[in-house]
Curated annotation (Swiss-Prot):
The gene is Slc22a15. This is Solute carrier family 22 member 15. Its main location: membrane. It holds the Pfam family Sugar_tr. Keywords: Amino-acid transport, Cell membrane, Glycoprotein, Ion transport, Membrane, Transmembrane, Transmembrane helix, Transport. GO terms for cellular component: plasma membrane. The keyword Transmembrane helix applies. It comes from Mus musculus.
Length: 544
């Protein structure tokens, strides 16, 4: 029998698969979320004041009065770290990399650069680890990446300099992003295909819980070095438990290693208490393969070109706004720990809400995505019309804090929807390529996001204007995409001409290419169903 039939025998979601979900979609995501937004606390700037007696006699300057004196401003533009060290005093409420290495004033950009370094590492990790796991196996690459992730993360806490810290943040990002992607692929390949969406939803939900958990931990641990090291205890526990999980049966089967695949399946069956099940794996004698598309095919066909450009921008905006609002939680006033916790917890309602709406005929994928993006954009844009410092009357409720949380709720819902929507818009022959290309732009948004909150130095509401304008624009552009609810899943390029896939007014538009016509007969005309394996290059809901 084939591997899918074998899963029906051993159990598609038995006790052992539930354990794997708990390990790889709950505990692991709590840890992954912590590393992703680590800089939100350890990069925060404690309250401080300036003692400029030597430069400006008989004056004392606080961080609320910076720039009032021309002499002070001129000095600040050229001051180096050692000079700043002599004249600034931080409060003892908590320590951070900003207070230890004096990353304030003209050096404050380095905090954002360290966060951007992490997301640059994620960008590299999701590309390289997908290919490595396809070649060497899911389990081996996952465990190796996880071990290095913990090693580099602990090194963060012992960084002797800012430069060492920034480099290790890049390495943590590469290992964290790569191994968490492979872990989710491994999880999906150990359960029945009907449960893949469930595993993704669980992972996304506990990523949000992980943000709140990190805020709680930071509230009790005020030393940034201690915090950076202790958050790895949870990761170490997950790593040790992961040493005993099997290799992916689907990957082994795809490599022709049938005896090892059978061994992995019997391992799962035993722990599912299916002791009497017996089977023998065989590859199908006659298997037809669909020709796969290339990256250039995304831009060769007119229909795909328009959809791809819009989707790339939407993915970019989702990541930019999601991480921008999360990392700027400390700039909203009040307790930084409460703000960060609320920023995570506010995501939880978005999961059931968006899943319900996208399956309703009167909303569907397109309208729901557009509604959440536009609502989030408008919530952020309204901030520009509010007074900077006024929390009385109506402004006690409608303020930058509440509107930021509304924006976080809506962008989280949009992020969840765009994964599902994108996979339905692309034909099977190019689905992985399309998802991977869109994911690249998501990573670019994550790299830029840490710098956007710094725009508050120019104008206090400017970060919200950026988030709002991009969110609203992406929402309006999403209306140009076709609806996919209850439409048949596209298989080949020729399926793009299906009426049910097209927007009103596109019926007469034939499938056209931007370069000389490409023969469609390169796409297999065989209709026989093939065995498909979950590819590690395909992004999932688990990896924001």
């Amino acid at each position: 029998m084939e591997v899918e039939e074998a899963f029906q025998a051993v159990g598609e979601m038995g006790l052992y698969q539930m354990y794997l979900c708990f390990l790889l979609a709950v505990l692991l995501q709590l840890y992954v979320a912590t590393e992703a937004i680590l800089i939100a606390l350890i990069g925060a700037t404690p309250a401080y004041h300036w003692d400029m007696a030597d430069l400006l006699p008989n004056q004392s300057h606080s961080n609320q009065t910076l720039g009032k004196g021309q002499a002070f401003g001129d000095w600040l533009l050229t001051a180096n770290g050692s000079e700043i060290h002599k004249h600034v005093h931080f409060s003892n409420s908590f320590t951070s990399i900003a207070s230890e290495w004096f990353l304030i004033a003209n050096r404050s950009y380095k905090v954002s650069a360290a966060s951007s370094s992490f997301f640059s590492g994620v960008f590299v990790g999701v590309i390289s680890f997908g290919q490595l796991s396809d070649r060497f196996g899911r389990r081996k690459v996952y465990l190796t990446g996880f071990a290095l992730d913990i090693l580099f993360a602990v090194a963060n806490g012992f960084s002797p300099s800012y430069e060492f810290f920034a480099v290790t943040r890049f390495l943590v990002g590469m290992m964290n992003g790569g191994m968490s992607l492979v872990a989710f692929v491994l999880l999906n390949e150990c359960v029945g295909t009907a449960y893949w969406a469930l595993a993704g939803s669980i992972g996304g939900l506990f990523f949000a819980v992980g943000i709140a958990q990190y805020a709680l931990l930071g509230y009790f641990i005020r030393s940034w070095r201690t915090l950076a090291v202790l958050v790895n205890l949870q990761g170490t526990l997950v790593f040790l438990l992961s040493l005993f999980i099997p290799e992916s049966p689907r990957w082994l089967y795809s490599q022709g290693r049938l005896s090892e695949a059978e061994e992995a399946l019997y391992f799962i069956a035993k722990r599912n208490r299916k002791l009497k099940c017996t089977f023998s794996l065989t590859h199908p004698a006659n298997r037809s393969y669909r020709a796969t598309g290339s990256f250039l095919d995304l831009f060769r066909y007119r229909i795909l070109l328009g959809h791809t450009l819009i989707l790339m921008f939407i993915w970019f905006v989702c990541s930019l706004v999601y991480y921008g609002l999360t990392l700027s939680a400390g700039d909203l006033g009040g307790s930084i720990y409460a703000n960060l916790a609320l920023s995570g917890l506010i995501e939880i309602p978005s999961y059931p809400l968006c899943i319900y709406l996208i399956n309703q005929r009167w909303f569907g994928r397109k309208r729901t995505l557009a509604a959440f993006l536009c609502l989030g954009g408008l919530a952020c844009l309204i901030v520009m019309f509010l007074p900077e410092k006024k929390d009385t009357g109506v402004f006690a409720v409608v303020n930058s804090h509440s509107l930021s949380l509304l924006g976080k709720l809506t962008i989280s819902a949009a992020f969840n929807i765009v994964y599902i929507y994108t996979s339905e818009l692309y034909p099977t022959v190019i689905r992985n390529v399309g998802l991977g290309a869109c994911s690249m732009f998501s990573r670019v948004g994550g790299i830029i996001a840490p710098f956007v909150p710094s725009l508050k130095e120019v104008q206090w509401s400017l970060p919200f204007i950026v988030f709002g304008a991009t969110g609203l624009t992406s929402g309006l552009l999403s209306l140009l995409l076709p609806e996919t609810l209850n439409s048949p899943l596209l298989e080949t390029f020729s399926d793009l001409q299906m009426y049910s896939y097209r927007r009103l007014g596109e019926e007469a538009l034939s499938l056209q290419t931007l370069d000389p016509p490409q023969p469609l007969d390169k796409v297999s005309s065989e209709s026989e169903e093939e065995e498909e394996f979950y590819d590690a290059d395909e992004e999932t809901q688990m990896i924001k």
